[in-house]
Amino acid sequence: MLSMKKILLALISIPIFLNAAEYQLSTHILDINSGQPASNVKVELYSLDKNQQWIKISEKFTEKNGRISDLLPYEKTENRPSGIYKLKFYTKDYYMSRKVDSFYPFVEVSFELSKDQKHYHVPITLSPFGYSTYRGS
């Protein structure tokens, strides 16, 4: 039988999960030169406004596992962002910190989000002289 303390803890936790923001966008960088996740890479998120100007939304750094999972929050399905966005990955800074020469000072990946999709994952595989991207899940 569950103790009263466990039941109360479970009941108190419910509102936290109900109000937690979901994230429509995540990214991941794999450094194929080293075979490791690329940690501490600065990544900026931009949206394209109606005047065709890029507006910076956020700036984050990849975690130790090379991921950023909390880009572009929304609270309700009807509030999901849509439109054209881009991620700007500061790859030269990453390779300079490892004392490795690289060709690309940064990598920009543009993409379009739809309100119909719950989540988008935009990973890149990276080397000092090349990169690749695809729509992940």
Regions found by a protein language model. Give the residues of each.
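Beta-strand-rich interaction surfaces with strong enrichment in secreted/lumenal proteins
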Residues: 57-61, 76-77, 108-112
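Short beta-strand/loop motifs in extracellular/secreted proteins, especially
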Residues: 39-43, 120
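Short Pro-Gly-centered beta-turn/loop motif in secreted/extracellular proteins
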Residues: 69-83
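Feature of secretome-associated and extracellular-like proteins
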Residues: 82-137
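Beta-strand signatures of extracellular beta-sandwich domains
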Residues: 42-46, 86-88
